[in-house]
A protein has these predicted regions:
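Alpha/beta enzyme core
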Residues: 2-173
Length: 173
């Protein structure tokens, strides 16, 4: 059962208890927020993370962004950035690499931190489409679904999904 389903059935999970204690709110406040979609608690079946509640009625969170580029691919530097962000008190981490071996970079970053790690599957899909087909506009939808699943299986806890991207937008990229 997932957190949303548990919350809707009235079940307060361990994650909800942890968030309530950290935020100074009641467990039922967190449960109701999760059930109604106003609070999220990024978790993953693939790895343990520092539990963090994000949403309405909770403190503002700090999200640190890291990632390689086509100009600089230094995984050790990205891992050090992730560790520094965690030491500095970041609540979550976005891994936004656009250069290098995406899965290897993300795997190593995910292994190096206890923070919830987010990603943007569309970035990888665009770059792979440009490499494979010569242009972003030739991206195949199955590639986006495959990449999204791969990133989830690596242990990313949340994703930015760009639902407003359409064919006309892609032609301009």
């Amino acid at each position: 059962m997932g957190l949303i389903e548990d919350a809707r059935r009235g079940v307060v999970t361990e994650e909800m208890r942890i968030v309530a204690a950290a935020e100074g709110v009641t467990e039922d406040f967190v449960r109701r927020g999760v059930a109604e979609g106003h609070i999220v608690i990024p978790v993953s079946p693939y790895r343990k993370v520092k539990i963090c509640g994000i949403g309405e009625g909770l403190r503002t969170k700090v999200n640190a962004s890291i990632g390689t580029s086509s100009d600089i691919v230094d995984v050790d530097m990205e891992i050090e950035k992730a560790r520094q962000a965690e030491r500095a008190g970041a609540d979550t981490l976005m891994e936004l690499s656009t250069g290098g071996d995406f899965l290897e970079i993300r795997r190593r970053v995910v292994e190096a931190t206890t923070l919830s790690v987010g990603s943007v599957p569309l970035y990888q899909a665009f770059i792979e489409a440009a490499r494979k087909h010569g242009a972003v506009v030739h991206m195949e939808e199955d590639d986006l679904f495959r990449i999204t699943a791969e990133q989830a299986k690596l242990g990313t806890n949340f994703m930015a999904i760009h639902t407003g991207i359409n064919y006309e937008t892609m032609k301009r990229l």
